[in-house]
Amino acid sequence: MYKCDKPLILASSSPRRKAFLDQLGLEYSVRVKSIDEFAQPEESPEAFVCRMALEKGSAVSYQHPDSWVIAADTIVCLDQKILGKPRDSEDAVAMLCRLAGRSHTVMTAFAIICEKEKISEVQLVETSVYFSSFGEVEARAYVATGEPLDKAGSYGIQGVGALFVRKIAGSYSNVVGLPLAELVERLLYYSVISI
């Protein structure tokens, strides 16, 4: 549907983010630099996720100054506390049990950076997700599938984890890990892509 008019790099190894860009028909390369992903003392979830997206993008953009770099970070927040990727299966079960029967917020920040053009921006998108009530047995059965172990909040809305979701308010693609409508709008604005 879209074509790239400028060199584009995705600074993420996420298969879900890659799939979204593939669905748009974009040509891009993938470059990833690891960074320390720890919240600063007193840093809000919003500030943390924005900083992570910018740091991931900047680390790649520095080495590819002529390219346009997209980077993103996604977190799940419950009661203003960040639920990242689970450490192990037990941590995943505990997270899911905390989310059961409640609403939480999924925040994805994406950064668009081009060193050559002196462009560096970040945008935060929030989606409310409402979980149905379920118990530890259901949480353990889901964790046993292996699906939640690499996902913020210990679930994947695009997979079996959708069984827990009663409703969402906001962007579905944001919950998966990349708010497409907002991203495409900015890439069109900078003439990085066109129809």
Curated annotation (Swiss-Prot):
Protein EC: 3.6.1.9
Molecular functions per Gene Ontology: dTTP diphosphatase activity; UTP diphosphatase activity
Keyword Cytoplasm: yes
UniProt keyword annotations, A-Z: Cytoplasm, Hydrolase, Nucleotide metabolism
Catalytic activity field: dTTP + H2O = dTMP + diphosphate + H(+); UTP + H2O = UMP + diphosphate + H(+)
A Gene Ontology cellular-component term: cytoplasm
Annotated localization: Cytoplasm
Family: Belongs to the Maf family. YhdE subfamily.
Name by which UniProt lists this protein: dTTP/UTP pyrophosphatase
Natural source organism: Desulfotalea psychrophila (strain LSv54 / DSM 12343)
